[in-house]
């Protein structure tokens, strides 16, 4: 583990509430700074999968999440240092917040909030402020945000949706009164929007050409409206990052010895797992299954697996030699017909007798049908879209042994979906939380709606590779 201090410039992009323009500014900053020739490390507070996709496109390296609830507060700074080091050391890290600056896990007094993460990584905050229908009161709002928690340093403001030059002058003068510098101003007419869906933005993988255009437009916008030198000065005011870098090899305790070979798969120059002689773990990817944390593949590789992505929309079969399968989240409901049309892969997954781990979208895909379209039939359930959004952090207890859990273990995860399954859980459920059973353990299959970040549960990766024996 690296343990010496690293003077990593870093800044947290936050807001008083959702909808103020954090993603616009953070993504634009990443793209604009990269155009300057800087190596930029992108990060996102919270469990969200979609924003990091845009961040990664803008920065040219994977977007990574920093979530104290999912991984534990002690791992947040090490994960930042790891992400900013792979595949090469970054010149600056940009961390987009979640919701409002002080909004975190319900009833936990700001735990897992953007403010909490800002203190854990000792980074200054750049506050994005929607100024629609606001004048001098904007300064009072910023003053309150700054004073609410004295450990959080609000180092500057970017004014968003400014109505006119006169409006901008009024806002700048008011913020000067409270001693908070304005580092940029974006007019209402200059806004750039990315298409949205019921769970947020449309993932990058589903609209690659359009996503490139949106990210380029955001970089143009920020370069034209934000004082990038002032933002860099703010980021450089962060003290050295003294936390040791998170190490996937140390987290899993080294490679597992298996019949198919036990050498560690390692990591390529691009940050992905290298292909070696370890057991092949197939990981669903493509437009329908975009929800995955970068550390999942790193942990599997460190445990000795060869990680092989496959696209259930296009690939007629699992990668050669597959010993285990991981199917994460995404939007299968938007691709149900195309998934149904790949009958050969559905049949192979239905008959696959190795360990399978599925989260949310993966759960739906393993069922008999989704909104009437045939799926794999590996699990005896049907699924359908509803108008109700189920979301939030969960504290769960494993209800049974499985390829990745042991009965009685406690984990922290999150749910985020608008679908339901019938039945809601199997005879042997995967989890128990909120006084109810959830998910399915069926033979060597573990499937549920719960998303878990494996950096907080590294034994899951090790166990899955062990289950390949």
Roles of regions detected by a PLM:
Residues 12, 94-96, 126, 158, ...:
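Structural motif
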Residues 279-342, 346-351:
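Phosphate-binding active sites in nucleotide-utilizing proteins
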Residues 118, 276, 290-308, 319, ...:
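C-terminal and late-domain segments of enzyme folds
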Residues 135-258:
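Internal gly/pro-rich beta-alpha loop/helix module
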Residues 85-91, 243-278:
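Intrinsically disordered, low-complexity terminal tails and inter-domain linkers enriched
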Residues 44-45, 182-190, 306-314:
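Beta-strand->loop->alpha-helix junctions that form or flank phosphate-binding loops
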């Amino acid at each position: 583990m690296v343990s010496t201090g690293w003077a990593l410039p870093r800044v947290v992009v936050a807001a008083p509430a959702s909808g103020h323009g954090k993603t616009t500014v953070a993504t634009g900053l990443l793209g604009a700074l990269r155009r300057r020739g800087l190596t930029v490390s992108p990060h996102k507070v919270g469990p969200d999968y979609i924003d990091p996709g845009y961040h990664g496109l803008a920065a040219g390296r994977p977007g990574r999440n920093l979530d104290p609830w999912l991984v534990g507060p002690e791992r947040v700074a090490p994960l930042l240092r790891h992400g900013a080091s792979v595949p090469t050391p970054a010149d600056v890290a940009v961390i987009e917040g979640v919701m409002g600056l002080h909004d975190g896990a319900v009833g936990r007094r700001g735990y897992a909030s953007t403010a909490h993460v800002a203190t854990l990584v000792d980074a200054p905050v750049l506050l994005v402020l929607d100024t629609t229908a606001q004048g001098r009161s904007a300064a009072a709002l910023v003053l309150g945000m700054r004073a609410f928690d004295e450990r959080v340093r609000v180092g500057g403001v970017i004014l968003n949706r400014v109505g006119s030059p006169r409006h901008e002058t009024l806002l700048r003068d008011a913020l000067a009164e409270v001693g908070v510098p304005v580092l940029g101003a974006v007019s209402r007419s200059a806004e750039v929007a990315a298409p949205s869906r019921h769970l947020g933005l449309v993932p990058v993988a589903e609209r690659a050409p359009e996503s490139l255009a949106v990210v380029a437009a955001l970089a143009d916008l920020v370069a034209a409206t934000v004082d990038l030198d002032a933002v860099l000065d703010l980021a450089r005011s962060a003290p050295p990052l003294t936390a040791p870098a998170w190490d996937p090899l140390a987290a899993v305790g080294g490679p597992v010895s298996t019949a198919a070979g036990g050498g560690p798969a390692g990591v390529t120059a691009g940050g992905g797992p290298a292909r070696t002689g370890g057991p092949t773990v197939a990981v669903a990817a493509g437009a329908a299954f975009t929800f995955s944390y970068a550390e999942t593949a790193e942990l599997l590789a460190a445990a000795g697996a060869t990680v092989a992505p496959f696209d259930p929309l296009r690939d007629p079969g699992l990668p050669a030699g597959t010993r285990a399968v991981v199917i994460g989240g995404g939007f299968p409901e938007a691709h149900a017909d195309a998934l149904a049309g790949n009958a050969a892969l559905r049949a192979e997954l239905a008959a696959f007798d190795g360990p399978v781990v599925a989260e949310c979208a993966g759960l739906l895909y393993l069922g008999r049908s989704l909104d009437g379209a045939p799926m794999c039939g590996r699990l005896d359930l049907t699924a359908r879209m509803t108008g109700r959004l189920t979301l939030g952090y969960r504290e769960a207890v494993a209800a049974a042994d499985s390829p990745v859990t042991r009965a009685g273990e406690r984990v922290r995860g999150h749910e985020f979906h608008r679908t339901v399954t019938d039945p809601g859980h199997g005879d042997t459920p995967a989890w128990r939380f909120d006084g109810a059973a959830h998910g399915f353990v069926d033979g060597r299959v573990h499937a549920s709606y719960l998303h878990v970040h494996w950096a907080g549960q590294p034994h899951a990766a090790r166990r899955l590779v062990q289950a390949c024996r």
